[in-house]
Curated annotation (Swiss-Prot):
Protein name: Threonine--tRNA ligase
Top-rank lineage group of the source organism: Bacteria
Gene Ontology, cellular component aspect: cytosol
Pfam families xref list: HGTP_anticodon, TGS, tRNA-synt_2b, tRNA_SAD
Residues binding Zn(2+), per UniProt: 336, 387, 513
Taxonomic path: Bacteria, Pseudomonadati, Pseudomonadota, Alphaproteobacteria, Acetobacterales
Family membership noted in the UniProt record: Belongs to the class-II aminoacyl-tRNA synthetase family.
GO BP annotation list: threonyl-tRNA aminoacylation
Amino acid sequence: MPAITLPDGSVRRFDGPVTGTMVAESIGPGLARAALAMEVDGALVDLSREIADDASVRFITRKDDAALEMIRHDTAHVLAEAVQSLWPGTQVTIGPSIENGFYYDFYRNEPFTPEDFPAIEARMREIVAANARFEREVWPRDEAIRFFENRGERFKAELIRDLPESEPISIYRQGEWLDLCRGPHLRGTADVGSAFKLMKVAGAYWRGDHRNPMLTRIYGTAWRDQKELDAHLHRLEEAERRDHRRIGREMDLFHIQEEAVGSIFWHPKGWRLYTALQDYMRRAQTRGGYQEVRTPQLVDRALWEASGHWDKYREHMFIATVEDEDKTLALKPMNCPCHVQIFRHGLRSYRELPLRMAEFGACHRYEPSGALHGIMRVRSFTQDDAHIFCTESQIAAETARFVRMLAEVYADLGFESFRVKFADRPEQRAGSDETWDRAEGALIEACRLAGVEYEYNPGEGAFYGPKLEFVLRDAIGRDWQCGTLQVDYVLPERLDASFVGEDSARHRPVMLHRAILGSFERFLGILIEQHAGRFPLWLAPVQVVVASIVTDAAPYAEQVAETLTQAGLVVETDIRNEKINAKVREHSLARVPVILVVGRKEAEDGTVAIRRLGGAAQEVMSLADAATALAAEALPPDLRR
């Protein structure tokens, strides 16, 4: 006789095993209509799942986040059924829900294209309208393998073979169609609703291995209602408008070419943006008590073997051999082992700790060409990397100090808020469980003492220690994980780093790995999209354009440009024999924040007409006042404080 405890604390008792549907109906017809699934003792399950023992139950309705994930998962199943009904013989593989949508991978001799989407979506809507119920069945393993093999579904059969022997083989039916799936699912296909859309196709290797067959991945998005779908599509349009690759072309910031895949050719304007950010970060680190260093890019494999990176990271490293010397070198994928070498060079005392060591370190990591994306995902990049060598008792103070610095930097760059995630031990890791217990405990205590609130991101720590991940939200609601702080007891042990303590004995330092931007390249991509290329004056690649209205004003335009340049501004002149409206349009497209318009009258009066990006009004000022005001506005925020 199960007793069901509801979220309000009330208890309902039943004479025998009950399903979630039965419990909802006992509460009222409104809940029975609204409930899509349920949590039983915290586990999300189908409404049809039987409850035989006492349990706490919470019903999931359409407004819950869990419902949205289930809508997306079920839409993937509807997609798979639609594809197989339209193209018999197509093999299905996997189809999970993902952020903002879902995908399903298919194996077919002829790949799908976006031209197939209208037919697929029409068939999907028919399946939704039919409202086939989702029904869970548990099959014997051998029977399930035979069934899928007989249907020519070799990928599904392989998945079943690889499941642990203890795991039940759950099959979900929706009408005549079925799929291998753990669930849970909604009540029926009608619960998916109509707020879905297929978005794109891509290639994907089976199980992510290039030695396996190439599959066609169809991506889609699904939402609770049409309003949410329309809002998402609008965000995508806005993301397209802000795409750093397009803006980079329009502003002449950088380019990428086949001869250097994954590496960036920075143009003069782009490099001005890069160095403005780097100079700002250098000042921030100097104020924060960091010492800047520089370490080699090519390092012998012996160091990577000692650090553990050779075993864990070799497939992502670029390797070079020196035949005459019988050496194997690697371009460094990260800076930390090299920083330990500087720490080890000479005798260190506890009086030197905490020792904060920073480097704008050039790193190289292999990424498959299909994973590269503009300047946001590349093979060669520069990190704002730093390592703090400290004692265990100093971790909390250094954590608090770093978080304050990070918050100030993000605010200066236009990001007012961020979230913190605590990433604990991954499955593949270095060090003993005892060491990880110690590191995780130290970081948790540091967060408590520093007043840092966080959410858990289980299993996502670095292979040598737990970490805090700092997540920015941009102007259109996207999250970007940029900053990190990692506690590492492993690398100092592996690389034999030590200091002489107050007791005159040798001790291991704790190593805090930290970054604020992550990589300059990726962060600049985020920054371009955050501002849609409309940078604050201090970051703008070209801060001011002086545009002449008539040819007679050209000498004065040059004089204005020289005055502004002497005031420290980055200035270009436009004295072409073109109409002023055409000049304004061109420089507005290039997102120049300030255009100074000068003609005969301005030349006679010693004035300039100031036009701001995106504005139609002009403000007339004397040249001296304009130079003073713009120079003050162009100061980086840290130099104004």
